[in-house]
Amino acid sequence: FDMAEHVTGLRVTSLCADLQTFHPTRKQPKHSVETFANKLLGPEDYIETPVDTEDFGAVVFRMGKRTRGAMTASQVSAGRKNGLSIEIYGTKCSVAWNQERPDELWAGHRDAGNQIFVKDPSLLKPAARTFADLPGGHSEGYDDTFKQVFRRFYSSISTPNGVPEYPQFVDGLRQLKILDAVLQSHRTRTWIGVPAFETGK
């Protein structure tokens, strides 16, 4: 939800959620495994462990009076590892971005051919250029977002009166309130309002 709110500038106002546990057991490594160690584990390295957490969620939501959204979160989609994507549909144009192809932005038009924009800092507007450190043809992705957040955090220390360009604790609190509404909606099978309050963005 945070990405949808950040990209659109709108706020989720209400939602309806459906959560599901498709796999009641999960494979748990018998021994600790380092993250990103690329160690291949065989069937003998796991034990089946019962779980009661959801592995799939579907949420429809409203952002104000006219904007609607739909979101799925899944750990059961074969072949999808860390997929994250967003699509925004307007009256004249649509845009789509996919984390697995971070340097591309797709734009769809009603009255012209579709386009794929490839990141090239020399062609970006100044406000966007500050987020691109590498020249065109050099991919920047998920791990680069942390660098950008830390850069903006440290910059705010030297200019304390500026507007923070990174998530604040209140932004995290807002996302927790949205997730509370997701759980409440799932339990009650009803639309749930999301409390409105200002965040750091």
Language-model features, listed with the residues they occupy:
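Active-site-adjacent "lid/gating" segments in soluble enzymes
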Residues: 1-13
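C-terminal glycine/acidic-rich active-site capping loop/insertion
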Residues: 6, 20-65, 87, 92-166, ...
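Conserved S-adenosyl-L-methionine
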Residues: 12-20
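Beta-strand scaffold of nucleotide-dependent catalytic cores
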Residues: 16, 70-73, 97-98
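Glycine-rich phosphate/pyrophosphate-binding beta-alpha loops
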Residues: 72-81, 141
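Glycine-rich Rossmann NAD(P)(H)-binding loop
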Residues: 72-76, 89-92, 195
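C-terminal hydrophobic helical "lid"/dimerization subdomain
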Residues: 172-184
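C-terminal capping/lid region of NAD(P)-dependent oxidoreductase domains
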Residues: 184-201
